[in-house]
């Protein structure tokens, strides 16, 4: 019987805001008792997680005094040590406080933009104190409901200026952060800048330090836009910009549901795990997901265990797919190579172009049947556990 227990090598992490979510939503209040960061660390230690991530105010309330901050940090460090947890990633809450109701780095108000930088610098210090090496930027309020309210070109310029500033700040302070940008098409704003992961992949080369910057794609956010998440992650991998990843699940075209990983679209989750494992992704596998609102405290533990267990099961099934003789024979069959033609098309040269123009390629003969139904059915049988 395979072992599906959490493997430390997988670097499974959860945010303080995930398992600590008391179940409130826009239509109803809290349904579970709020638990402290120390209690969350104890919970994650119990279920076998590798680490925990946080926004600055998940750990330290925005109005905490310096002595209160120091005590919170001290207590949390002890809880991390007691539970053998690490903090791989930190981020800033630039969306909850009323000051950010119309944006943070992209706000029309220079004082708000300055406060956003100040708050982020302090949050970066907090993350560095816990050893975080990835710093995520999710622009929760960076957007509009009406384009009459802000010039989108200026908004992008403002965002670039802020990131350039913070890159230099990280270098100056010796934090050695890698920045990871997280896209989302809407919610809480009606329309959000950098709506999908590809938006950030296009934006990063324009920065002063593109080598420091990558992406943190999230399953739910790309599904909200109706996109194939595996393809978004593949683009990030190919660009060498997959610095972090948020795993959860989501029905297409809905509000941000943040379901338990693999609970809504199992086939998509399978191909995601296969992609990450096939390409040797070595970063954190962060479950930015939430237990059902109906769950009690014990069921929240089941939720956390379920996220990790599903990943481990799909990892095993991906390995089985890769070694299934019938599947691999089909893969070989559908990938038709011609060494001479491949050599000609790999890099342009005038001579190569002439040879390709003169090549006797029969378009009618190229219309061949492909066994894709069979391949997909075999894939489904692997996922369903009958192969």
Model regions and ranges:
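Active-site/pore-lining binding-face segments in mid-to-C-terminal subdomains
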Residues: 248, 256-328
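Acidic/histidine-rich catalytic cores of soluble enzymes
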Residues: 7-14, 146-268, 356-387
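Active-site-proximal loop/turn and secondary-structure-junction residues that shape catalytic pockets
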Residues: 18-20, 56-58, 91-96, 139-143, ...
């Amino acid at each position: 019987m395979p072992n599906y227990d959490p493997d430390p090598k997988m670097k499974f992490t959860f945010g303080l805001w995930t398992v600590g979510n008391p179940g409130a939503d826009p239509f109803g209040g809290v349904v579970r008792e709020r638990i402290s960061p120390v209690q969350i660390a104890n919970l994650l230690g119990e279920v076998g997680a590798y680490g925990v991530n946080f926004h600055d105010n998940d750990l330290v309330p925005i109005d905490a005094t310096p002595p209160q901050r120091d005590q919170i940090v001290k207590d949390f460090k002890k809880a991390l040590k007691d539970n053998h947890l690490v903090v791989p990633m930190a981020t800033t809450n630039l969306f909850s406080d009323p000051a950010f109701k119309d944006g943070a780095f992209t706000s029309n108000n220079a004082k708000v933009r300055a406060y956003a930088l100040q708050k982020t610098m302090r949050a970066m210090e907090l993350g560095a104190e816990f050893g975080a090496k990835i710093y995520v930027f999710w622009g929760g309020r960076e957007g509009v409901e009406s384009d009459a309210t802000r010039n989108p070109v200026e908004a992008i310029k403002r965002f670039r200026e802020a990131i350039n500033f913070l890159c230099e700040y990280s270098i100056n302070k010796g934090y050695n952060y890698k920045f990871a940008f997280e896209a989302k098409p809407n919610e809480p704003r009606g329309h959000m800048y950098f709506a999908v992961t590809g938006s950030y992949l296009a934006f990063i080369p324009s920065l002063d330090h593109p080598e420091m910057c990558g992406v943190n794609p999230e399953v739910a956010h790309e599904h909200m836009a109706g996109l194939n998440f595996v393809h978004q992650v593949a683009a990030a991998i190919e660009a060498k910009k997959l610095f972090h990843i948020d795993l959860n699940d989501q029905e297409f075209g809905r509000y941000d549901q943040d379901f338990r990983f693999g609970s809504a679209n199992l086939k998509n989750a399978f191909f995601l795990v296969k992609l990450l494992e096939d390409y040797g992704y070595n970063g954190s596998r962060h479950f930015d997901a939430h237990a059902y609102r109906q769950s009690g405290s014990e069921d929240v533990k089941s939720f956390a265990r379920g996220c990790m267990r599903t990943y481990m099961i799909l990892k095993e099934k991906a390995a089985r797919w890769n070694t299934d003789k019938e599947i691999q024979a089909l893969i070989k069959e559908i990938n038709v190579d011609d060494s001479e033609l491949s050599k000609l098309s790999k890099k342009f040269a005038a001579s190569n172009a002439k040879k390709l123009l003169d090549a006797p390629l029969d378009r009618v003969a190229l219309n061949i049947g492909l066994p894709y139904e069979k391949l997909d059915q075999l894939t489904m049988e692997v996922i369903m556990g009958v192969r």
